Structures are given as C-alpha cells and as structure tokens.
Amino acid sequence: MIVRLTSEHPDGARAARRLRARAAAFLAALGREDAELSILLVTDRRIRTLNREWRQKDQATDVLSFPISEPPGAGALLGDVVISLDTAARRARSDGRRVGAELDRYLAHGILHLLGYDHERPADARAMAEKEAELARAEGLVGAALREGRREGRAGEAKDRWTRSPTSISTPSRSGSTARGSRAKTSRAGSRT
C-alpha cells in the first residue's frame, strides 16, 4: 500500500500525519492493501480553483476525488483525494467537533468515490453512507464522532456525520482531470465528494 500525502496548506503538517495513517487504515479495512492513493491537503482558495476548473462550480468545497481508472477502483492506482483543511476547520468549529473527525469523514468519503461509490440516487447515497459508517466503526471513530458532535435525527436517535446520508453533495465528472497537476490530464474523472 502506498499513500502519498502533500500539504499545500500552511497549517497542514499535523493533519497530514493523521490523514496518512487514517488512509492506510481505511484502505486495509476495505481490503485494498494493494492500493496506491494520493492525498492533497489544500486551502479553500485552491480547492475552489480545482472545483471551478473541473466541475464548473466557482465555490470552495470540502473534498474532491479524481479517480485514475475507469471504472473507478479497477486498478491498484486509485487516484487523488483533495481535502480543504479550511472547510474542515470551519465546519468542525460550527458543529462542535474536532477538525480531525471532520477530516476523517472527508477522507473516507473521497476514498469511497475512488472505489466507485457515488450518491447520485437515494439508494446509492444510502449504500455509500453505510460504507462510511462501516469504516468509522472499523476504526473506532463513531463513538468519538458522537461525543464530539452529537446530532438528533428522526425519532430522536443520535446521528453524526458518519451515519447521515449525504444530502447536498453531487458527483458530476469531467474526463481528463487531475488533482495535483503532476499527471497528464487524460482519462480521469473529477468528483465532488
């Protein structure tokens, strides 16, 4: 397993160490010890530029995925996950959670997109949310996430970002995208995750 992590964020060193370790754990839990993954930790400004370039959406977002293969997840080289540390910090603050818990969620979500999961239809969104929750449970993150940011769901049950289905997230793709600009812009699809 190879996890490459680059931080373009001035405050990203600590988060980068966490994400590298968490990515290895997630890939192992998914049975993808053969995988190669690149993670890029960026500012809102940088992710906004990527979102505008590859998705024609001129706004910052939390995480983008750029699968290498078609279909996603078909080969050992999975692709790139780009995460905005600024967005993670802002949402964690507003939701009363630790930044690390927010980053874990974005990473799990991005990796699942690289493996072919999406949330275009309600059934797909549920399946993806269930897989995210499974990863969180496997890594012991659900209890911590609940302690850090408890939410009330329907019928009063506790919900957190690991167990809620994504609602405002879309996954359009554009052939030829690249997250880091280090690979040729051919046969890649970008997904907002």
UniProtKB/Swiss-Prot annotation:
Ranges of compositional bias, category Low complexity: 164-181
Q: What is its main location?
A: cytoplasm
Where does the record place it?
Cytoplasm
UniProt-annotated binding residues for Zn(2+): 109, 113, 119
- EC main class here is hydrolase
Compositional bias, Basic and acidic residues, is annotated for 147-163
Q: Which GO terms describe its molecular function?
A: metalloendopeptidase activity; RNA endonuclease activity; zinc ion binding
**Protein name per its UniProtKB record:** Endoribonuclease YbeY
* UniProt entry tagged with the keyword Hydrolase: yes
Domain of life (superkingdom): Bacteria
Task: Summarize the protein's role.
Answer: Single strand-specific metallo-endoribonuclease involved in late-stage 70S ribosome quality control and in maturation of the 3' terminus of the 16S rRNA.
Q: Where are the transmembrane segments?
A: none
Report the EC number(s), separated by commas if there are several. 3.1.-.-
Signal peptide location:
none
Record carries keyword Phosphoprotein: no
Cellular component per GO, a single term: cytoplasm
> Positions of the region Disordered?
143-193
> What family does the database annotate?
Belongs to the endoribonuclease YbeY family.
* Keywords of the record: Cytoplasm, Endonuclease, Hydrolase, Metal-binding, Nuclease, Ribosome biogenesis, rRNA processing, Zinc
- What Pfam families does the annotation carry? YbeY (PF02130)
> What cofactors are annotated for this protein?
Zn(2+)
Q: How is the cofactor bound?
A: Binds 1 zinc ion.
For this protein, the record's Gene3D superfamilies field holds: Metalloproteases ('zincins'), catalytic domain
A biological process from GO = rRNA processing
